[in-house]
């Protein structure tokens, strides 16, 4: 279970727990912060966050669940800003929405990976959204990048930094 301290879950971003999902974001200059997403019909006011110490904001949403999409809405004076969660573990794409993800469900066992020797590494640094896109209107995604792996392999690339 996720670590809890006096009814407040510890951590940043979307924090999955048995009773829903807690959210925490650092926004020291905001006057107000809300979470909007599929769990509240993208309402910009249904789920306000409470200011904590040191510029963080927190809320716990019992009806939010793994797989729901979300964004933060920050208010500062007359400005209203919609922002992605910098701690999101999954996103729809680099300009899209965050997705609530439970890191405890990932299978870390059974994979055999051997790193090539240091002097043989050919590392390609990749930004998924700009590596390859099917159209100019939408950023690339992991599926479109995966289609081009054979090309990178032919070039001699044996490691990718995402």
Predicted regions, residues:
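The feature marks proteins involved in alpha-glucan
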Residues: 1-22, 44-47, 51-125, 130-137, ...
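Short proline/glycine-enriched turn/loop motifs at strand-loop junctions of beta-rich domains
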Residues: 26-33, 64-65
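Short beta-strand elements bearing conserved aromatic residues within extracellular beta-rich modules
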Residues: 33-35, 70
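Predominantly extracellular/luminal cell-surface or secreted proteins
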Residues: 36-38, 75
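Gly/lys/ser-thr-rich phosphate-binding loops in alpha/beta enzymes
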Residues: 40-42
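Catalytic domains of carbohydrate-active enzymes, especially glycoside hydrolases
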Residues: 147-162
């Amino acid at each position: 279970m996720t670590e809890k301290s006096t009814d407040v879950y510890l951590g940043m971003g979307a924090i999955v727990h048995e009773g829903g999902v807690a959210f925490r974001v650092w926004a020291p200059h905001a006057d107000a912060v809300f979470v909007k997403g599929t769990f509240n019909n993208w309402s910009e006011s249904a789920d306000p966050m409470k200011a904590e110490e040191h510029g963080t904001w927190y809320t716990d949403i019992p009806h939010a669940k793994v797989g729901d999409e979300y964004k933060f809405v920050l208010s500062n004076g007359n400005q209203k800003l919609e922002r992605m969660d910098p701690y999101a573990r999954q996103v729809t794409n680099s300009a899209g929405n965050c997705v609530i993800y439970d890191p405890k469900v990932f299978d870390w066992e059974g994979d055999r990976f051997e790193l090539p020797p240091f002097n043989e590494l050919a590392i390609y640094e990749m930004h998924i959204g700009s590596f390859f896109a099917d159209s100019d209107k939408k950023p690339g995604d992991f599926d479109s990048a995966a289609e081009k792996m054979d090309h990178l392999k032919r070039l001699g690339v044996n490691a990718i930094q995402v």
